[in-house]
Amino acid sequence: MDIHRCRFVPYNPQAINALAFSHPPSAELAGRGVPTLRLAIGRANGDIEIWNPLRGAWFQETVLRGGKDRSIEGLAWTLDPPEPGPDGSKLPGRLRLFSIGYSTAVTEWDIEQGRPLRHSSGNYGEIWCLAAQPRWQATRGKDGKLLPPAEGEFTGQHLAAGCADGSIVILSTADNDLKYLRTMRPSTKRSRVLSVTFQNRNTLVAGYADSSIRLYDIRSGQLLRTISLGKGPAGGTKELLVWSVKCLPDGTIVSGDSAGEIRFWDAKNYALIQRLQGHLADTLDIAVSAKGDTVVSGGADQRTVVYRKKDGEKGDKKARWTEVMHRRYHTHDVKTFAVYETRDISIAVSGGPDAAPVVLPLREFGKEHHRKLSSLPQIPQLASSPSSRLVMSFWDREVSIWRLHRGPASHENADGQRHRLVGKVLIQGEENITSAMLSADGKILVVATISTIKLFSVRRRKGDEKGTLRIQKLDVPKALAEDGARVVTVAPNGQWVCVVRPNSAMYLARIRPASTAQEKPHIHSQLVKLNRATRHTRFEKASHGTLGEYERTVRCVVFSDDSKVLASGDLSGCVDTWALQNAEDAPKKHNNAAGSDDDSSDDEDQPVIEGERWSHAAGESPIPRLKSGVVLLSFRPPNPAKTKLLTNGAAKGEHRLMALTSEHQLVEFDAVEGKLSDWSRRNPKAFLPEEFRGVKDRAMGCVWDLSAARERLWLYGTSWLWMFDLNQDFPSPEELNASADNHEDENASTQASKKSSTQKRKRNPFEEEENARKKPNSGAGDRIPLAQSDLFFAAKMRKIVGSDEGQGEWMSLDKERPRAPDADDEAYDYDEAYTANNDVALARLRRERQFIETSTPLKRVSIGGKQDKLLLGGDIESPSAQKQLVPASADSKSQQPSRRWWHTYKYRDLLGIVPLGSDADDADSDSDSHFLEVAVVERPMWDVDLPGRYVRDYA
């Protein structure tokens, strides 16, 4: 594979200004998070990213695009009260997302359509901070029963917005609306409100820029108390800036100010309990645990500091706070935190100007590693035209197109440049680009925002030696241009463009190519609406809330190589396919099949454009819903070497659709039949390489490499690249275990021949201890081995019953918590052991059947293990080998067997990988000597210009 490592794409990751989980932390909740748990990340360009923690996988589902001169400075989620159902049950309330951004408005977002839903503004200053009222919880009466809410009591969540003029605005979210309720303003000078939080449902705590903290009663708007922090440090400003205020579960107020101090205030008399010098610069934000025994602070000195509550000595009932550890997880300011906890997970997510979210273990701090998520978009904002050697990228409101030359011997780069910017498009308006696509021949460019769609004709200027492009705007029908799109794509033949509306409605438009060089392509005025198959709706519990139709959001759309089949995948795991047929040859649907009436009527109503009609490809047996959201879809291209063997006319090509889920389950379907392919039946998820199943970063895209001897699928994420040869099956777990045992036996016999027979292997107590520790993490990184731990927290305790110390029993503190007998099974992780065993058994039977039918002898060979390296000449260096089974051939002794998989972590901060090369040049070449040519676009953070930061040295 020929690789062009490209770092010329000036994509600029935006700073993280706000973080918010959709659910509050709760130490009483079982499991690893509710199904509707999401993390919203607000960035400096107005984008809001929606992440699904996915039990530690961290999957970026969608991005709510911002616009010109917009910024997200605060985020808050609310949950509407549950509604009564038809059968007396309670229907879950809707989860709602709100944001602020250096304006006088609070914006509510429609996450189903990815656009603002409503705004609330008034006659007050710029909003600097935002907080949501705690959720209403029922209390128990004297008899132990839960009491209903009082008559007229609001059980929803109000919003509190702190303004630059010193006022605090209370907004009501009742009746699925956002209305002004009241304004609270101190009677003294007008000072900025920098931070707000709730001590309880009725008491609001606000931090000001005048060295004070004020408490209000939101029911009456009355000022309850003013807490003074005193003067600032010597040599600095007189007044302290209270950048952050938080409240512990017992009501204790925690504040962080511009002096770098953390202060604890009594919940009742508001007296100062303790102050700690946590930072050498401003303390920008604070996070507290659900139990109130851990506090985390971040500051402008790039440090993250953890504080723990320590019980007093004997006779002293007062508990004291002490600093446990501080580290630099960020390369710039630590500006914001978000916390989520259950019984099994405990994490804090931090962000700042360095644009990368960092996931920290909160309860297991010091026992688990942190994890840094990517600052780059998880949906590649790249496309290429292989025949024209063009690479397109977009960000904000700009589209750039580069041309990559072949190499030093190319006549196109006489000046020595390997790449050249040949075209740029600036989109008018305020909205950022949601999606853009360049056709395979490089002649059509489609650009979409949330409000409009634009098409451009791309041609090479005549007589221009530098290859500059001439980009002309095409006339787009009003029906296509209006309402915008969240995803757009172009068919490989350039005759169809598919758009996914903000509400995930799918449409197709026909493009008529230009007949002469002077003409422009023409877009047909009539659109084809594609109806997706009806799926069963998942109902959540009332306490979980609902995201509406958000799970049905279409994330990816792809055409087959012959442009006759279209597939889409959404966040719920549903895959839909459509086929292009001649109107006269289209088969008629029979209504004897259950549920086929609607599909038949929809297909018959589809318009006929130039004698062709789109219909459901798998209408009789739709593709079943996958277990998790679809990350990417890709049709396996037809192998040109194998197609040449068919001489009786054009062969009917198979449309095999490869799907990868957010849990990294690799599945291949027959898109027309709606069934699993033979390869997918023989290779379930349990057969995938163990290291690939353990990759934390989710996949972003894929590239195919096909020839007579190989059918390789290259998958990539932000920090990894994997290759799978689909001509071969993955080894089963039994084969891997047998190979590992044989390898250990060989090593043992070799070592025994060198050592004396009287020598015995010493047992390592650290290895035994590590094997006994629990494997699951708490939501961040992997567990830190005891030998590498810096804190050395106790891993065991001695349990003594009675007065006899000799009967004491040592118990491990790291064992997995047993499941409560009355706990909800849905709150715990899904146990896939039974399903995996069935998949393995079925795959084994299918492989035995294939072996009997083909009668191909198998032999055992070695492949490179985890330490393999790819050398410059394409050779493989294998210091440690594993065993695998591959078919034997007549000349197998002279040829090295092909690898089943290969991976590398050499490339970091990948923005995307796109194919290059000319099909015309490759047509006459030998298929065996054909090599895949790709452009690997990297965007490391050290190439990004960041604002100035605090550089003072500290211990």
Where would I find each of the regions flagged by the language model?
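Conserved strand-to-loop turn within each blade of WD40 beta-propeller repeats
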Residues: G42-N45, I100-S103, G162-D165, G207-D210, ...
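Short loop/turn segments immediately following beta-strands, especially the blade-tip
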Residues: T173-D177, R219-Q222, R308-K317, L362-E368, ...
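Short C-terminal beta-strands that terminate individual repeats in beta-propeller domains
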Residues: R7-P10, Q60-G67, P116-G122, Y180-S187, ...
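A short helix->beta-strand "capping" segment at the edge of beta-propeller domains
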Residues: M1-A15, R55, R320-V324, G416-L426, ...
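C-terminal scaffolding/assembly regions of large eukaryotic complex subunits
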Residues: D2-F8, P25-A27, G31, S543-T546, ...
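Short coil/turn segments that connect the beta-strands within blades of beta-propeller domains
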Residues: T36-L37, R94-L95, G156-Q157, R201-N202, ...
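Canonical WD40 repeat/beta-propeller blade segments in eukaryotic WD-repeat proteins
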Residues: P13-G31, D69-S89, G125-E151, K189-F198, ...
